């Protein structure tokens, strides 16, 4: 979905925050002991600490003893969390503390603090019977940044659009000679001069685009829209002077009736549909590439939990592709009376069969050391295997086919791997039932 690893890492961060939002929204507490605190990047820790001290004084007057103690406890937890930071991190700080009531009716303390993956320009402090995640949700909605080049006969404008924020990066005007029938014997010379000036103008636009939209050898926008009233935009998109890296990012050519800032606004309006589908298109492209490896039988692919984990262990996986709602759980069990551990990967159906958790020889239950969704384990560990992780949906035709046909887990490999001819060492420790995929 993303051409460079940093964008893929960002997608994983987004998935983690989506998961966090889901669990925070579901949490409920008694009284108003659940604190949501968001500190924007340029704020001071000392100001927030003073505000919390004032709140502590106010909360001491709460009449209900139970509520008073739980609110004071939550404020103290937040104060302890803030002590871990000398200053507010570059992207701001998000803290959630409080006592929640679990499904079994038990009370459980929650303390979460993290720096979001991009600046959060919201200041928030709320005590309530639920956590407030609206600012985090807003952070996810406007993620990708798009570049715009508005080019016509009178000048060029370069801008970006991220969410609802548009920014003009650079603009310049140009004075190109118009076509005319005068000149007599010099008519050809005039035409040649005009073509030369036009050529130089397109070159200047192409060079400026590289300066603005490529940083550190990588394109810094998710896609480019070329807009204009004449055929300059077409000329630019097909020109050899236009950088190949930018050429591959062009999403759409848009016809507009104005130049400059008005043209920029019109270009944004006319390309909204394309921009909203970018993630969708990237996903189709990624899974399409995966299917190509399979149809050409290159051997540079894997699917299903067992093969994918083998390939990861070998360091062969370049791109690990996992369905966002993959329902496979990863269990680490310790066999009773020994230090030996075994790892199981089970679907909800398989989890119902308790024999997986019982030692066949002794009939005793294994000790559960760790259990978490497999996707979460991948999100925490994929870098150790030298892979990039792409989390996909089933909303596109390709995505749906990937989930139904390949179990929602697979990978594009760096080199050919023969899984059938390979005896997996320690394979007895793992449990897979491939009938379920």
UniProtKB/Swiss-Prot annotation:
Role: Component of the eRF1-eRF3-GTP ternary complex, a ternary complex that mediates translation termination in response to the termination codons. The eRF1-eRF3-GTP complex binds to a stop codon in the ribosomal A-site. ETF1/ERF1 is responsible for stop codon recognition and inducing hydrolysis of peptidyl-tRNA. Following GTP hydrolysis, eRF3 (GSPT1/ERF3A or GSPT2/ERF3B) dissociates, permitting ETF1/eRF1 to accommodate fully in the A-site, followed by hydrolysis of peptidyl-tRNA.
Residue numbers covered by motif NIKS motif: 61-64
Complexes and interactors: Component of the eRF1-eRF3-GTP ternary complex, composed of ETF1/ERF1 and eRF3 (GSPT1/ERF3A or GSPT2/ERF3B) and GTP.
UniProt gene name: etf1
SUPFAM superfamilies per the UniProt record, alphabetical: L30e-like (SSF55315), N-terminal domain of eukaryotic peptide chain release factor subunit 1, ERF1 (SSF55481), Translational machinery components (SSF53137)
Keywords from the UniProt entry: Cytoplasm, Nonsense-mediated mRNA decay, Protein biosynthesis
PANTHER family xref list: PEPTIDE CHAIN RELEASE FACTOR SUBUNIT 1
Organism (species): Xenopus tropicalis
Protein family (similarity comment): Belongs to the eukaryotic release factor 1 family.
Places the protein is found: Cytoplasm
Molecular function terms from GO: translation release factor activity; translation termination factor activity
GO biological process, one term: regulation of translational termination
Protein's name according to its UniProt entry: Eukaryotic peptide chain release factor subunit 1
Recorded GO CC terms: cytoplasm
């Amino acid at each position: 979905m993303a051409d460079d690893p940093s964008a893929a890492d960002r997608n994983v961060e987004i998935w983690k925050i989506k998961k966090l939002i889901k669990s925070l929204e579901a949490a409920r507490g008694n009284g108003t002991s659940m604190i949501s605190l968001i500190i924007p990047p340029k704020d001071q820790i000392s100001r927030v600490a003073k505000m919390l001290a004032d709140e502590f004084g106010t909360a001491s007057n709460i009449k209900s003893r139970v509520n008073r103690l739980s609110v004071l406890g939550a404020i103290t937890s937040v104060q302890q969390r803030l002590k871990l930071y000398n200053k507010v991190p570059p992207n701001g700080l998000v803290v959630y503390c409080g006592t929640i009531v679990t499904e079994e009716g038990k009370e459980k303390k929650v303390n979460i603090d993290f720096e979001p993956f991009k600046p959060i320009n919201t200041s928030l402090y709320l005590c309530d019977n639920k956590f407030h995640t609206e600012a985090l949700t807003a952070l996810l909605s406007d993620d990708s940044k798009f570049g715009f080049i508005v080019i016509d006969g009178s000048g060029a404008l370069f801008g970006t659009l991220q969410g609802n924020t548009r920014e003009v990066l650079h603009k310049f005007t140009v004075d190109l000679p118009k076509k005319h029938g005068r000149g007599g014997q010099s008519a050809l010379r005039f035409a040649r001069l005009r073509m030369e000036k036009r050529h130089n103008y397109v070159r200047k636009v192409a060079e400026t685009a590289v300066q603005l939209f490529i940083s550190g050898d990588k394109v810094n926008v998710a896609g480019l829209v070329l807009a204009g009233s004449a055929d300059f935009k077409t000329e630019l998109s097909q020109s050899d002077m236009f950088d190949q890296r930018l050429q591959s990012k062009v999403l759409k050519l848009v016809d507009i009736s104005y130049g400059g800032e008005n043209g920029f606004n019109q270009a944004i309006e006319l390309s909204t549909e394309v921009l909203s589908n970018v993630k969708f298109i990237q996903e189709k492209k990624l899974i399409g590439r995966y299917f190509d490896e399979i149809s050409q039988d290159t051997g540079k692919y894997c699917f299903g939990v067992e093969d994918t984990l083998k390939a990861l262990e070998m360091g062969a996986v370049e791109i690990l592709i996992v369905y966002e709602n993959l329902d496979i759980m990863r269990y680490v069990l310790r066999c009773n009376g020994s230090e030996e551990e075994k790892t199981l990967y089970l679907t909800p159906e398989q989890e119902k069969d308790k024999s997986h958790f019982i030692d066949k020889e002794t009939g005793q239950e294994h000790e559960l050391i760790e259990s978490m969704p497999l996707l979460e384990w991948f999100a925490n560990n994929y870098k150790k295997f030298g892979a990039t992780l792409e989390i996909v949906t089933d909303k596109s035709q390709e995505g749906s086919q990937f989930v139904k046909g390949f179990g929602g887990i697979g990978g594009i490999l760096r080199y050919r791997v023969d899984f059938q001819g390979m005896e997996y060492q320690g394979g007895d420790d793992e449990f897979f039932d491939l009938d379920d995929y």
